[in-house]
Every structure is written in C-alpha cells, then in structure tokens.
A protein has these predicted regions:
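Post-HExxH zinc-binding segment in Zn-dependent metallohydrolases
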Residues: 168-197
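C-terminal secondary-structure termini that scaffold catalytic or DNA-interacting sites
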Residues: 198-206, 220, 237
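Second-shell loop/turn segments in exported
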Residues: 40-50, 129-140, 172-179
Length: 283
C-alpha cells in the first residue's frame, strides 16, 4: 500500500492567529481526478441529531461546479466507529461523539498518497462542547460541519482571528459563526480543481483511512492516553510539537511504517499553555 501522510486541522472552542489570506487552499491538497468535476462520497456516521447539519453542508459544498458530495446515509453509527472515524480510501467519513473537553470543536483530517493527492478524509464533531449551552445552537453546529468538510476537500481558513470582521464564510473563524460557504470559497475550489490529473484518488480501493489522531486518543501530548515519547515514531496521539505561534500549534507523529501524521491545533483561549510535550519552536 502507498505510504500515507495524514494532516489534520482542528477548530478550537475559541482561538486566534494569522490574518486574512486571499488564497486559502490547504497547502494545495486536493483529490486527484481525471475529469473536470467528480463525485465524492461522504459517509454519514453521525447520530440523527446531526443529520440535518451534515446534509445541509453536503448540499452547500455541492454548489461548486468542481465537485458533488454524495451522502451515504447508511454509515455505521456505533460508538466504536464514531470514536475512530476511519474512512475507506477514496471517501470521507463524518462522525460525532463526546470526545472530551480537550479544547476543540471539530477535527478534519486527510491522508495523502505518495504523489500528494488526498485519498481519504474524516471529520469529528465534539459533542462534549456542542452539548454545552454556548455551542448548542444551530449556527455553531452548521458552521463547524461546513468548515470541517471544507478542509476534507483541501480548503484552509480564510481568516483565523475571531476578532476580525466577519467574512461571511464558514471557513472564517468568527463569533457568532457563519454557517455557509461564500463565493470566495467556491472560487478557490475552482482554482484548486482547475486542472485534471492522470488518475482518480477518490475511487481508490484500500483499507481504513486516518483515525483522527492516535487510534481514538484525543488527549493533548503528555496527557492521558497520549503519553508516548514525543520524538519517537512509536508515540501515540498527536506526537511531538514542531511549530507554535500564539494559539496555533502543529504536532507530528511518525508511525513505524513511515506514515506521517500532522495535526494542526488552534487552542482555546486559556488552553494554549496547559499541555505538555512542546519541543518545537515559536515564531
């Protein structure tokens, strides 16, 4: 099987860093396809209370003329599946669960083949926060669902400063949140998918995709289930810190088979310094 590189982006409960970017692709990550548009299967493994938000986000992203998200409404909703949230190669799985009060509302992760194309993705929605009164509204749930699925197709954030003026996009950090993509999001997808490739990564056969960080472990480095040695390829969870700037931090874990896992974290205010294992550098 091809070596996979897994990257994850985490939306925190509150956090701030970086400014507005005109180009908000996520490091040019995209799904390989041989046609100008493609159908991407989203396996819905959320509980019924999330179905409406997932269906709405899938419909919104399908307004792009470059991709059409197809909802698989028969996704397994067992707690085991939702904790790991693995997706088959060529597809995306979205899950919800009480993952713990660890500072994030949602995670989006992608796995890359050896040519740098996305071959699988996943999204986790953290009910430990969405069950709280502050985050229980439709606006937060819809916005985070929209944003994390946007990451799964290769989009980054338009802005990561909660205090900036709203850009009216779910790919913008803002409070109160905005629930839908905007024209710039669709234009960015048009640029990212404005070419064709020599093969289709969305139709690959294979086993499970990324597991959302550490085989279900969602604890910060040095805490709880994530007590592996930070510089070891055997470490579990997020691994070692390789970058930190304000409330933003990036962790890397390397598996014995060479698979690399990158996790981008935007810490909640008050959480940026209460985790262990930082051995990276600040900018």
């Amino acid at each position: 099987m091809k070596t996979k590189h897994l990257a994850a982006s985490i939306l925190a409960t509150l956090g701030a860093s970086n400014a507005v970017f005109a180009d908000h692709s996520w490091n040019d990550y995209h799904w390989a396809r041989t046609t100008s548009s493609f159908d991407l299967t989203i396996i819905n493994s959320t509980t019924p209370d999330w179905d409406g938000y997932v269906s709405q986000a899938i419909s919104d992203w399908s307004q792009s003329n470059k991709l059409n998200m197809i909802e698989d409404v028969n996704g397994d909703t067992s707690s085991r599946t939702r904790r790991k949230c693995n997706a088959p190669d060529g597809m995306v799985r979205i899950c919800n669960l009480e993952y713990g009060q660890n500072g994030w509302l949602g995670i989006a992760g992608i796995s890359l083949d050896n040519q740098g194309h996305i071959i699988t993705g996943y999204t986790k929605m953290n009910d430990s926060y969405f069950n709280m009164a502050y985050y229980s509204g439709d606006d937060w749930k819809q916005s985070v669902t929209c944003q994390e699925l946007g990451h799964d197709i290769g989009l980054g954030h338009q802005d990561e400063d909660f205090d900036n003026e709203s850009l009216f996009s779910c790919m913008d950090y803002q409070d109160p949140p905005y629930e839908y993509p905007n024209r710039h999001d669709y234009d960015q997808l048009g640029i990212m998918y404005g070419h064709t490739d020599s093969y289709n990564s969305y139709s690959n056969d294979g086993g499970d995709g990324g597991d959302g960080g550490g085989n279900g472990c969602n604890a910060p480095p040095g805490k709880g289930c994530n007590k592996g040695e930070s510089n070891s390829g055997q470490s579990i969870g997020w691994g070692r810190s390789v970058y930190k700037r304000g409330n933003a931090e990036v962790f890397m874990r390397i598996d014995p088979d060479g698979t690399r896992h990158l996790t981008h974290v935007t810490w909640a205010i008050g959480h940026e310094n209460d985790h262990g294992g930082h051995d990276g550098h600040q900018h």
